[in-house]
């Protein structure tokens, strides 16, 4: 089996304890030589400053290729592009451009009066600067707000045509879900690489709730597996095995890149990567 290229998603810490956990995650996973790491942007733009700080610190302290999430929510065009310019000034040239989730308790996305109306407008503006590699989100089981799968794929094509060069998918539980989506994208004329998003399941109850909220289908057999694993105190063993099997199936189907949603908890992601043959780089200086 071919060894995949990998990347990781982190989220910015809000507390000192969370900061320690983020850096533990970075120190654990960075030796695996990720192609890039991304840093999220909270719902409603709630972590805007935290994201900016985390992106700058990660880039400066680690030398990793850091991709900053950037959204359209609750900011004018001028403010949003100023943040992007701050990233560029700090040496960060990769952005994950998203519409963004509306603030909790709101009735859906409402553009800022002077802001970008949607993700395509944001992508186009970023592309015009010529400063960034732009990635976008994709939904193998369609975005919850999309009318249908065809409309969702058409929207993804618009994002690629606006200037994005790659797409990262929402997580899913079965490889065939991704393959059907990939085939549909190719049929729609989307030639940009589509990177599967992988969620190693740290907590089945939480993962199940999140899957339901974002429209990810939950196979019935997963409930049975985790019910038994939790009773037998083998949750992590099952989670590692399932994620490894999913990734292996994707690689066998031609996937070359995998993007892991780490939730700032590195152990399962590290174990899955090791099982896939992704191991820390060792130099002569390390062993001398």
Enumerate the language-model features and the residues they cover.
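Catalytic domains of carbohydrate-active enzymes, especially glycoside hydrolases
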Residues: 25-40, 161
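Active-site glycine-rich loop that binds ribose-phosphate moieties when present
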Residues: 145-164
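Short, well-ordered coil/turn segments that N-cap beta-strands
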Residues: 2-5, 33-36, 62-66, 91-93, ...
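Active-site pocket-lining/capping segments in soluble small-molecule metabolic enzymes
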Residues: 17, 113-139, 183, 188-245, ...
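Active-site beta-loop-alpha junctions enriched in small/polar residues
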Residues: 10-13, 40-44, 69-75, 98-101, ...
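Active-site-adjacent beta->alpha loops and helix N-cap segments on the catalytic face
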Residues: 17-20, 45-58, 76-83, 101-126, ...
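Conserved, mostly hydrophobic/aromatic
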Residues: 9, 37, 87, 159, ...
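Active-site mouth loops of central-metabolism enzymes
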Residues: 5-23, 66-78, 135-151, 227-241
């Amino acid at each position: 089996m071919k060894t995949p290229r990998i990347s990781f998603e982190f989220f910015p810490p809000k507390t000192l304890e969370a900061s320690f956990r983020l850096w533990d995650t970075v120190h654990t996973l960075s030796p695996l030589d990720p192609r890039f790491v991304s840093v999220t942007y909270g719902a409603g733009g709630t972590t805007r400053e935290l994201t900016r700080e985390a992106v700058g610190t990660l880039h400066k302290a680690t030398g990793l290729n850091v991709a900053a999430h950037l959204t359209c929510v609750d900011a004018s065009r001028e403010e949003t592009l100023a943040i992007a310019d701050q990233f560029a000034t700090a040496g960060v040239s990769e952005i994950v451009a998203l519409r963004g989730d509306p603030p909790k308790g709101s009735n859906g996305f409402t553009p800022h009066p002077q802001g970008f109306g949607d993700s395509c407008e944001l992508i186009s503006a970023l592309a015009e600067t010529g400063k960034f590699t732009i990635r976008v989100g994709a939904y193998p089981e369609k975005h919850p707000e999309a009318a249908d799968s065809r409309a969702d794929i058409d929207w993804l094509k618009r994002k690629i045509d606006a200037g994005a060069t790659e797409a990262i998918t929402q997580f899913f539980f079965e490889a065939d879900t991704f393959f059907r989506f990939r085939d549909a994208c190719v049929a729609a004329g989307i030639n940009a690489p589509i990177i599967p998003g992988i969620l190693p399941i740290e907590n089945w109850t939480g993962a199940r709730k999140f899957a339901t909220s974002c429209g990810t289908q939950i196979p019935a057999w997963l409930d049975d597996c985790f019910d038994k694993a939790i009773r037998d105190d083998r949750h992590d063993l099952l989670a590692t095995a399932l994620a490894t099997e999913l990734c292996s199936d994707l690689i066998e189907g031609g996937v070359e890149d995998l993007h892991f949603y780490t939730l700032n908890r590195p152990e399962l992601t590290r174990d899955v990567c090791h099982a896939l043959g992704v191991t820390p780089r060792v130099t002569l200086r390390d062993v001398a």
